[in-house]
């Protein structure tokens, strides 16, 4: 579990190019401008390639993926 969480946070940090995603797991990714629609596509591709978790863009709801903690929770539900 802890390893999975670290992997997700590493991917988030790389795609967002911002280490706040590891420092504050409740930061609002979209409201704070850390993540935008272009980055979401990159994020989903990275999740598929590195974690073997496929999330289609149509299944991505910004309200359910708004913080690093929420991203981890959603991916745990899917995998």
UniProtKB/Swiss-Prot annotation:
Pathway: Cell wall biogenesis; lipoteichoic acid biosynthesis. The keyword Cytoplasm applies. The keyword Nucleus does not apply. Keywords: Cell wall biogenesis/degradation, Cytoplasm, Phosphopantetheine, Phosphoprotein. GO terms for biological process: cell wall organization; lipoteichoic acid biosynthetic process. 4'-phosphopantetheine is transferred from CoA to a specific serine of apo-DCP. GO terms for cellular component: cytoplasm. Its main location: cytoplasm. Residues 2-79 form the Carrier domain. The modification O-(pantetheine 4'-phosphoryl)serine is found at residue 37. GO terms for molecular function: D-alanyl carrier activity. It is found in: Cytoplasm. Carrier protein involved in the D-alanylation of lipoteichoic acid (LTA). The loading of thioester-linked D-alanine onto DltC is catalyzed by D-alanine--D-alanyl carrier protein ligase DltA. The DltC-carried D-alanyl group is further transferred to cell membrane phosphatidylglycerol (PG) by forming an ester bond, probably catalyzed by DltD. D-alanylation of LTA plays an important role in modulating the properties of the cell wall in Gram-positive bacteria, influencing the net charge of the cell wall. Belongs to the DltC family. This is D-alanyl carrier protein. The gene is dltC.
